[in-house]
Amino acid sequence: MFAASINSLFSEKFSLLEGDFTPHFELFDQDNKLFLSKNFIGEKIVVYFFPYADTPGWTKEACGFRNIYEEFEKNNIKVIGISYNSSDALKKFKEKYNLPFSFLSDSKKEVAKSFGANGLFTPKRMTFVINENGKIEKIYKKVNINTHAETILKDLTS
């Protein structure tokens, strides 16, 4: 309980707001390929931060995105997960659950901090919808791991 309170205080001060431009970042994905955020200007992207790969809560959330991923693709929406895990851990998780989208390793915790999603020990479970112009369209600070993917898809397609 104490750690959760500290995590909240730790990142609230630096949170981005809807309408802000997304910070530019470079991270390695699960295959150790460099992901450059600037290369995705012109595309809508869902970026979600999560605590740890292969934990019960995060597995539900990731599989929720997997289960309706085709709908995201049909609507030209990319999905990307970011955590402090190593690229290797993310690759194992992606393969274990047959997850069709990319995961990025923020092992230095710099990207989470730039988004205001950093916590003391893990990133906060937060999601950012980034529009085609690189601006934050929507921020989800409260996440229901069972329905999160469906909620985002509904919000973006209705």
Language-model-detected regions and their locations in the chain:
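Short loop/turn microsegments at loop-to-beta-strand junctions
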Residues: 22-23, 44-46, 124-126
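A short beta-strand-turn-helix
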Residues: 25-45
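Short pre-active-site segment immediately N-terminal to redox-active cysteine/selenocysteine motifs
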Residues: 43-45, 50-54, 86
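Conserved redox-active cysteine motifs that mediate thiol-disulfide chemistry
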Residues: 49-67, 71
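N-terminal targeting signals for export/organelle localization
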Residues: 1-28, 158
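Thiol-/selenol-based redox modules, centered on thioredoxin-like
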Residues: 124-158
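Short, internal strand/loop/helix patches
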Residues: 80, 91-125
